[in-house]
Amino acid sequence: MAAKDVKFGNDARVKMLEGVNILADAVKVTLGPKGRNVVLDKSFGAPTITKDGVSVAREIELEDKFQNMGAQMVKQVASQANDVAGDGTTTATVLAQAIVNEGLKAVAAGMNPMDLKRGIDKAVAAAVEELKALSKDCSTSTEIEQVGTISANSDSSVGKIIAEAMEKVGRDGVITVEEGQALHDELDVVEGMQFDRGYLSPYFINNQESGSVELESPFILLVDKKISNIRELLPALEAVAKASRPLLIIAEDVEGEALATLVVNNMRGIVKVAAVKAPGFGDRRKAMLQDIAILTGGTVISEEVGLELEKATLEDLGQAKRVSITKENTTIIDGVGEEAMIQGRVAQIRQQIEDATSDYDKEKLQERVAKLAGGVAVIKVGAATEVEMKEKKDRVEDALHATRAAVEEGIVAGGGVALIRAASKIVDLQGDNEEQNVGIRVALRAMEAPLRQITKNAGDEESVVANNVRAGEGSYGYNAATGVYGDMLEMGILDPTKVTRSALQFAASVAGLMITTEAMVTDLPQKDSGMPDMGGMGGMGGMGMM
């Protein structure tokens, strides 16, 4: 085991604070409408330019191990804010820095760290309740656009495209962000249920121009197994042929004789048919087949539940208004499933999302909800260069998370005003002793830090602005972009309540732990002994001089 270096008391806290300040100072220059960019060097390719707080924080690793511990703890604040709310990472970092700096001053003055922490926790819990009371529902498209614009660093084009995407696919719809090919942003909306499986044979194509299969009012046969024997399919094919309607087969696979016979029947015009593989793998495939069955009013033919393909009737088949199949994707539009059944399925998947532990599972379940409930929108980010593209994509993703958070928990006045109003409501809060009261005052002072930093980045006098905003009421605040005081909600400067709340909670949580630190332990750098001597060459006996 390597030898350890240990620091105690003030020595430890000073080093930790230095690390906190180095990281926070690099992150906080990005805050607000006039925040600056940070350039991040990469080991390969061009440097990355960003205004995303968590991207800056993740890049910072300090040489001094004690300083690095402080920096890593603040990095944790930014990462947690990003994971929970998807935005507010810079605000959380600024709050954590303010609480740690104020708190450690009180510790140096002889206050009890544990009581300070209890006071801070008490103030934050009260402030969170006040934030909830200040919160307004985010219901209109204009408000969604404003939240997106603010989160994308006052880029109104981003706010507009996110609001448009939400309008088209609904609040539950999936919105994804991709790198586009054009110079401007594009919005691509897929209505209905789309999954990433294309036709099994190009001979199914009936629209030569687009190279796709278009089926009008088809029956949909859902099978949870491989189909290789055509005899199993004959009863369903005959029933569909009599009804003179097309058929889409979605199965684990269709191969050999079965696929060849379907192709021949299709080409001869006996029955208009197409086959695709079922989406997903394993249990996820079974679940998605069931989703399609509920959406189209059909039944999954599965031997697990005692249903045989030979005995399938028209009643077992799903139906839709239209199906479009390309080489890569299948889209089912207007399935005839009952609305109550679809809503029940959506509620069931939502419950699974709450119970899921991995982000990957949550994302996949959320996609299934969207496919059942609304649709999928893809925002394709446009830019002139790859460096600009990456920077803009980061901002669009932040803005998208912020708008989702706003829809979920509502909105409060932006620009750091909500925290100042929450602090002013709890100014009379008392702890159990004087040291807890100091902790409460530390938290209240720290809650001004985001407004002060936004003002400082805009090149204005932070104390003057903070006093003016404190003297106001409600959503009265300072628009750093224009240098004007006024109603923040009317000026469209909004923050999602969830973002502000989680930034404060995570900052206080980690800062409280740092204030109560009394010792720090790290590995001593190992002394490098260099390469060992190679030693002389052994004698080569028997080789006398000639």
UniProtKB/Swiss-Prot annotation:
First-tier enzyme category under EC: isomerase
Instruction: List positions binding ATP.
Output: 30-33, 51, 87-91, 415, 479-481, 495
Q: Which GO terms describe its molecular function?
A: ATP binding; ATP-dependent protein folding chaperone; isomerase activity; unfolded protein binding
Taken from the UniProt entry, a GO cellular component term is:
cytoplasm
**Reactions performed catalytically:** ATP + H2O + a folded polypeptide = ADP + phosphate + an unfolded polypeptide
- The EC number(s) attached to this protein equal 5.6.1.7
* Pfam (any one): Cpn60_TCP1
Record's SUPFAM superfamilies? GroEL apical domain-like (SSF52029), GroEL equatorial domain-like (SSF48592)
Task: Check the record and name the InterPro entries matching this protein.
Answer: Chaperonin_Cpn60_CS (IPR018370), Cpn60/GroEL (IPR001844), Cpn60/GroEL/TCP-1 (IPR002423), GroEL-like_apical_dom_sf (IPR027409), GROEL-like_equatorial_sf (IPR027413), TCP-1-like_intermed_sf (IPR027410)
Keywords on this record?
ATP-binding, Chaperone, Cytoplasm, Isomerase, Nucleotide-binding
Q: What is its main location?
A: cytoplasm
Q: Does the keyword Nucleotide-binding apply?
A: yes
As for subcellular location, the record says: Cytoplasm
Q: Which GO terms describe its biological process?
A: protein refolding
Q: Whom does it interact with, and what assembly results? A: Forms a cylinder of 14 subunits composed of two heptameric rings stacked back-to-back. Interacts with the co-chaperonin GroES.
What function does the entry list? Together with its co-chaperonin GroES, plays an essential role in assisting protein folding. The GroEL-GroES system forms a nano-cage that allows encapsulation of the non-native substrate proteins and provides a physical environment optimized to promote and accelerate protein folding.
Q: Which NCBIfam families does the annotation name? A: GroEL (TIGR02348), PRK00013.1 (NF000592), PRK12849.1 (NF009487), PRK12850.1 (NF009488), PRK12851.1 (NF009489)
The similarity comment for this entry is: Belongs to the chaperonin (HSP60) family.
- HAMAP family per the record? CH60
| Name of the protein in its database record | Chaperonin GroEL 1
